[in-house]
Structure formats: C-alpha cells, structure tokens
Amino acid sequence: MPKGYWVTFYRSVSNPAALTAYGKVAGPAIAAGGGRILARGAPARAYEAGLDQRCVVIEFDSLERAFAAYESPEYQAAKKLLEGSVERDVRMVEGI
C-alpha cells in the first residue's frame, strides 16, 4: 500500500506565537494518528516560482491515515489555535 503525505505551505504567518502554540498541540495529535514529520521550515532554496514559504511534509502509512489524522478531533482542536494567524495551503497526496 502506498504511503500518504500531508504537505503544508504557509503563505503568511502574522502571529508566530500562535504557530508555536499550534505546534505543541498539533505534533502529538499528528503522531497519535501515525504521522512522522519528515521536513519542516523555510526552504533552503526556492526554484521556479521562487516562493519563500514555510513548508511541512508529514508521512503516513497510507493516505487514509493522513485523512483520518487531519479530521481527528485532536488535530481540529490544534487547528483552531491558528485561526486568524496564518494563511496556508494543506494538501494530501499518495506516494508512488
């Protein structure tokens, strides 16, 4: 079964303290859902469109596990901590 990947790009962060608080709650919620953070932070180098956006890549044993972790009550509680503080794009993709 192919792995699932949760990829988030942060277009803007207006409240870094909210992002820190989110991380403290989201990390355990994601881990409880089977997620493993593979990469997190600003790009070392940006190509093509050249957007310098914070990025997070999380691996799951399957795409279904990624969906379930995102939709879990624990993660949804963490997500509320970001309201009004970030603009981001969250995508789920299946590995090959």
Spans of features found by a protein language model:
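C-terminal structural segments of small proteins and small subunits
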Residues: 63-91
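Short S/T/G/P-rich N-terminal loop/turn motif that feeds into the first structured element of a domain
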Residues: 1-54, 61-71, 94-96
